[in-house]
Regions:
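Terminal accessory/targeting
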Residues: 3-150
Length: 150
């Protein structure tokens, strides 16, 4: 499936949500590191073959970290610590931001996490923290342009 998806993305000039580099700091919890490295090798190989821009790393916030679900401030502190120690390159943070609603509460038990992810993206302190650490927020359109220059 990955190879076919990357070929189609290459045909249309789209980026793809996969990663091209492995780093233990951004290995999803429960994923053996060797599996991360193997998938990285395939995505890098096929992405290069078909000219598909992808982030270097894909970061999955781990909501099972003790204390992370206690409060928005605890969540924010944990995420900002991670973002302050990212590997060099382009990292996509995989989040599901959402506005609090009865519908959201009815479709997922993780509704509070999603609301906090939304709050974090609007938080001026977060924006200042990223600026202070040289982290720039970009879109996939900008990713495609950046990777095309390389």
């Amino acid at each position: 499936f990955l190879k076919m998806a990357l070929r189609i993305c290459g045909d249309y000039g789209y980026g793809y949500r996969m990663y091209t580099s492995a780093d233990k700091r951004v290995c999803p919890k429960g994923t053996p590191y060797f599996l991360l490295k193997a998938s990285t090798l395939l995505s890098r190989l096929w992405g290069k073959r078909y000219g598909v821009p992808m982030p270097d790393y894909l970061l999955f916030p781990d909501w099972s970290v003790p204390g992370m679900r206690d409060s928005y401030e605890a969540y924010k502190k944990h995420i900002l610590t991670i973002w302050g120690n990212l590997p060099e390159g382009i990292t996509e943070t995989f989040v599901h931001p959402a506005v609090e609603s009865d519908e959201l509460k009815g479709i997922t038990n993780a509704w509070q996490c999603r609301v906090w992810e939304y709050q974090l993206l609007k938080d001026p302190e977060m924006h200042q923290y990223l600026k202070d650490h040289g982290v720039e927020l970009i879109s996939y359109r900008e990713l495609v342009k950046m990777k095309a220059k390389k």
